[in-house]
Amino acid sequence: MPYRSTEILSPGPADKAPLHRVTLTHDQRHLRRKLLHLENDDVVMLDLKEAVMLADGDLLALEGGGYIEVKAAEEALYEIRPRDRLHLIELAWHLGNRHLAAAIDEGRILIVRDPVIRAMLEGLGATVNEAVEPFHPLRGAYHGTGHHHHGHGHDPHHG
């Protein structure tokens, strides 16, 4: 019989020891209702009221007690290295303008591999290398608002 969870603890408190673990890619961590396969071959039915973006270390609270830990899976990524800080800002702008998920650090940006985007970045002078590691992109400005649309000139006060 599968476990069932209707609640997320984010971030997972250090004093809550998980019973099991589920490892998911970035795309797989965006969910509302799904049967998840745990590392020990058990399953948990996640049944939330609304869609969430799970993060590495979150805990799924199980009905009847106990927790399942969410781990970020290693993914095939591009590691983008800029010439300097100003170049990092420019590259981040181009990625954001294309609505791409990106993990931005002081000296690098990580994105999911896409050869077209790689060519664009290299054309902008970036060094792009393949990497395999967990992907923790920044949450966007519209994260948690319950929708994914945004205004592009729809406000009559902004031309």
From Swiss-Prot:
Q: What is this protein called?
A: Urease accessory protein UreE
Subcellular localization(s) per the UniProt record: Cytoplasm
Q: Where is this region: Disordered?
A: 140-159
Gene (name only): ureE
Cellular component terms (Gene Ontology): cytoplasm
UniProt record similarity statement:
Belongs to the UreE family.
Q: What sections of the protein cross the membrane?
A: none
One Pfam family cited in the UniProt record for this chain: UreE_N
Q: Which organism is it from?
A: Sinorhizobium fredii (strain NBRC 101917 / NGR234)
